[in-house]
Amino acid sequence: MSATTVTYSPKVFIPLTMLCRDRCGYCTFAQSPARVSAPYLTPEEILVIATAGSRAGCHEALFTLGEFPEERYPVAGEWLREHGYQTTVEYLVAMCQLVLDETGLLPHANAGALGHEDLAKLRRVSPSQGMMIESLRPDLVAHRGAPDKTPERRLATLHAAGELAIPFTTGILIGIGEDRSDRIEALEAIAAAHERFGHVQEVIVQNFVPKADTLMRNHPACSIDDLVDAIRLARSILPPEVHVQAPPNLVDDPGILLDAGIDDFGGISPVTADHVNPERPWPHLDTLRAVAESRGRNLAPRLTVYPEFATNPRRWLDDNVRFAVLDRSDAESMGRDDPGATFPERYEAAANVGSGAEVVQIGRRSTAWYSGADRLPPLLVPAEPRATGAVAEALEGVRQGQEPGEAEIVTLFSARGTEVAAVAALADELRFAANGETVTFVRNRNINYTNVCTFKCTFCGFSKGPLSLNLRGKPYLLSNEEIADRVREADALGATEVCLQGGIHPDFDGDYYLEVCRTVKAAVPEMHVHGFTALEVTEGARRLGEPLPSYLARMRDAGLKSLPGTAAEILDDSIREVLCPDKITTNEWLDCHEMAHEAGLRSNVTIMFGSIEHPKHWARHMVRTRELQKRTLGFTEFIPLPFVHMASPIYLKRRARRGPTWRETVLMHAVGRIAYRGWIDNVQASWVKLGVVGAQQLLQAGVNDLGGTLMDENISRAAGAAHGQGITPDDFRAVVEPIGRTLRQRTTLYEPVQPLATKEAAR
């Protein structure tokens, strides 16, 4: 996450119960039984609130409640027993699980001073928890009627949360009768707890605002000077990794809070009020965004659990909530920022698989964009470009002719808000310098010759067979004559390339791939054979016991011209161990492509992004392939392939994100253009996974190529993509002409294709 980022949590506020055994002098949240319609919200009422929040794009369900109301009010205990619960915390645990299951919102339990046992129960259903320290001064009049507000109880809860490794939110309430030394004491106690346990993710500095109908209604409000001073104290006393938050609805100018040192605005709800401060409505996100941008910052959504904790789930998250956090995370473990709903996805086996996915989604549908979905992405480019801080420095370095290294590439991937447009704008400048206003495409046909595979790639929804992870669907293996027929059909439709890919069939040896090449060339001698990944040729050579350079030379002589870069996935072995544990390693992929280039073959660089990896892995992938290109000049293009999650086994096993966000997709193409400048001049958008409307945005972010017309593309469709199965040049033309570009057909190796009329005249 960039240092220029200001975060907030899009949330709904769920007041589970407004009954409380404490009577604080400043509180309007707590009510008596006579003033509430029921002691607790019902499950149905809770789901109405949570569902509305999920539809509005929220990630958090903030459960706020009075402390131990059953200890004070018999009606509370009676209600709980009638509904099958013994305590408020027991009911809270059940409702957190309900919201998690039905809406996917991440519960944040703000249940007050709890003991070890109750905190542990909530840890299973709530990725983060919170409790305000408020103040450690024991003689505050404001806390005279509040047995749960003693310093001992608050500190005991803070420490118990640390012992249980709970990502924890706490804070101080200023202006309730304490003085500056009291604030310092509380902040130092919080800092000491964090130094011991490492669990404090954020500290709220909340200013007291007097409210009518409270004992402190005539008490003066906390001054802005005191608030600013307290924020500065927090920033100086707390360890730097602890985030500092202040509620923006309790001040007239939220910019003051940023100037004082906060980096988080806290929870902001588009659908519910601030039930603790109902007289102070949430500021609109556009207002907060403008405030942040006026100070060179960008506003970004986060989850209830901060990235520092979400990226180490084994320590900080219970197994029960890990996937729920992952499912709403982007690659930096921030909140996914595409507008729309993100509901939990449920699947059942498809009745008729064909060439599509083996599972179908049932139940409530998400409306946010994701790779392969039949919906429009948000408009990120073109937009007004503006960057500050590290992103601006990295962009300026590129403009000065510097080659971005791994650190600079990671920085560019951290761009948010107007920084995304700035990265895209530079990428588009470099695109124009390399390619002008021409957008290219190739007429081709995919021939997926078998879907039987002995390898166990955890992301693959395409392969079928006894050793694959997906056992439904009909395995097939095309005959040579079927392959030849498809090549001739492709030629009749104007294709210049066939793209050959398939599973690693247990009956194949290396001669099979040679035979396929000869079959294609016999059917249509001038057809370009683009086929066989590094995995296929490496495995073919291994099964023959032949050195790979020798085998590649024989493949070349049989008609192979270029290799697809697929099988690269992410060129980092820590990621490959999860995605493709029995596949070739990073070095084996790189070595294979280097040998292919030395044999006179060409290939491309692909990257499958958006599953389990992070920006540092993207950067390593780019640097490693760039270094190879410097030695061989054999790569023709860079093709980002967004992970399509819907029918992917690793997603169905709840171990992957739901693909990249649109921001990440734009950046992958733009940063790729920047990182490969001068070495790989062509950047392609995969319309199969992005749709043609998405591809149009990317043409303004560094992309110059739309790939192939792809008759018979069924690998992406097997993973659940809605796109695929062919597109026409007229479809491409409708994408490029509205943005002032010219469409041109190319060969696989980016040579111009002679127009059909000219070829016929030449005959």
Q: How would you label these PLM feature ranges?
A:
Residues 6-7, 11-45, 68-69, 439-482, ...:
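Canonical Radical SAM [4Fe-4S] cluster-binding loop centered on the CxxxCxxC motif
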Residues 8-14, 34, 64-84, 207-219, ...:
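Glycine-rich, proline-tolerant flexible connector loops at the mouths of alpha/beta enzymes
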